[in-house]
Amino acid sequence: MSTSVFNRRWAALLLEALTRHGVRHICIAPGSRSTPLTLAAAANPSLVCHTHFDERGLGHLALGLAKASTEPVAVIVTSGTAVANLYPALIEAGLTGERLILLTADRPPELIDCGANQAIRQQGLFASHPTLSVNLPRPTPDISARWLVSTLDSAMAQLQHGALHINCPFAEPLYGGDEQQYADWSASLGDWWQDCHPWLRQTCYPPSLYQPLAQQADWFFWRQKRGVVIAGRMGAEEGRQLTAWAAMLGWPLIGDVLSQTGQPLPCADLWLAHPRAQETLAQAQIVLQFGSSLTSKRLLQWQTACQPQEYWLVDSAPGRLDPANHRGRRIICPVGEWLSRHPAQRRTPWATELAAYSESAQAQVIETLAGQFSEAAVAHQLAELLPDNGQLFVGNSLIIRLIDALGQLPAGYPVYSNRGASGIDGLLSTAAGVQRATAKPTLAIVGDLSALYDLNALALLRQSSAPMVLLVINNNGGQIFSLLPTPEAERQRFYCMPQDVNFEHAAVMFSLGYARPNSWPQLREHVHQCWLRGGTTLIEVQVPPSQGAETLQQLVQQVTLIPQVAP
């Protein structure tokens, strides 16, 4: 028996089965134990192979590919700590819904817990975070090809949200052997190899709790009431649909930076602090929230405190998604589908004064930031930097809060982020995956600590298939902690942790373009030139450390003093 050859037969069938469920992209890290999987991936013409030397970044690369393609994406890593490095991306996928298939090569059972090199207990390593887990046996011809392909088909049919962990033990040898051996084992599947469908076509009907197909019977009653719409994270087309739907109802729409609604009432994080705006919103009889992962502090505070007669939350992801635990309805359904089943009725807007508060807040922002070249000013004017027919990736921490509070992105413009666990790890890798999946011009904006955290992902950005700009806002540390009541004496050393770096040499190391503009006109011109010439350019904007946080706090205070608007 040639173990190496049968390992490869087994792996080839495994990967072919995954392609029948829509897997096109596969991300591969170097390793010996994963050789059967790697060689099978390289030989499969249906797969696009991506490589990276850092498994943590590799997992986030796959996450970005899955976000932008909305398809399942596979990952191959070797045994040992390489597997554990996938944990952050797996956690994020579980919270935001991207489908990742983690193929983790493993030592065979007899090499576990006996001191063998690079052998750890991989089964169950990820605890409850994967949606599904499959622990495959050591490959052997005694196990039929039908069993393997049926097992994979069943798991993939159940995977609607989050990650699937497939642990794959392989015994040595891993190389060499007569490639013609065990052809009969593969051939036992007959003409399936020439087909394009799964071997086992399993249909999974969701439980009744998740079955939103019937229209809410009392919708025709509630659509005549005073309603408020909250828009969280959703797709571009859903954002456009929701904006038109809410406008027809005459209901105010408070849109998150990730809602892609165009934020018809911009600067909500500011004007929601105004007492009169809160009084107006308190008159709402029903609140409908579409999507989750809200960014704005003031919106979250209002969302927690509001007490409408009904609170409905619509999102395709499972789970409650409401930290405030409102009494109401949790409808697990795609936003677009729900809107089409619940038509709007044209009604006169009931909260017109909110538009006045929004306009006043926006005017205050423009006046305060006039002539500045600052973190807040870049966030406010970010829409001017976006490429035509492109996309935006927004990092976490302070920058996304500033864009949400001070900016206004175009309706339907694709925006991506990692706002499930909201970590700063893997952001550059995720942005690289988003760009590769779509081949669109991409603007990614992150802070300096986020860039440092994932610095070796600059290697992934060398391979952009369309112009890409990585905008690093260097405020010298984690200045989001300047927004929090952290102890002032310990703030810099233990929270902000300034690193006093610039990124010019990092860009040179990875053969990227680099610029460090000193004014808004320079920044705008640099970015415009990047869209024309292609490749990836790292543009660093150095700003005073705490200015962005201080500006946001100042604007919140100023907006609360806006004169009352007559209803």
UniProtKB/Swiss-Prot annotation:
Swiss-Prot/TrEMBL cofactor(s): Mg(2+); Mn(2+); thiamine diphosphate
CC cofactor note: Binds 1 thiamine pyrophosphate per subunit.
GO molecular function, one term: 2-succinyl-5-enolpyruvyl-6-hydroxy-3-cyclohexene-1-carboxylic-acid synthase activity
Keywords, ordered alphabetically: Magnesium, Manganese, Menaquinone biosynthesis, Metal-binding, Thiamine pyrophosphate, Transferase
Organism in which the protein naturally occurs: Yersinia pseudotuberculosis serotype O:1b (strain IP 31758)
Lineage of the organism: Bacteria, Pseudomonadati, Pseudomonadota, Gammaproteobacteria, Enterobacterales
Name of the molecule in the record: 2-succinyl-5-enolpyruvyl-6-hydroxy-3-cyclohexene-1-carboxylate synthase
Gene from which the chain derives: menD
Subunit structure: Homodimer.
EC top class named in words: transferase
Pathway as given in its UniProt record: Quinol/quinone metabolism; 1,4-dihydroxy-2-naphthoate biosynthesis; 1,4-dihydroxy-2-naphthoate from chorismate: step 2/7; Quinol/quinone metabolism; menaquinone biosynthesis
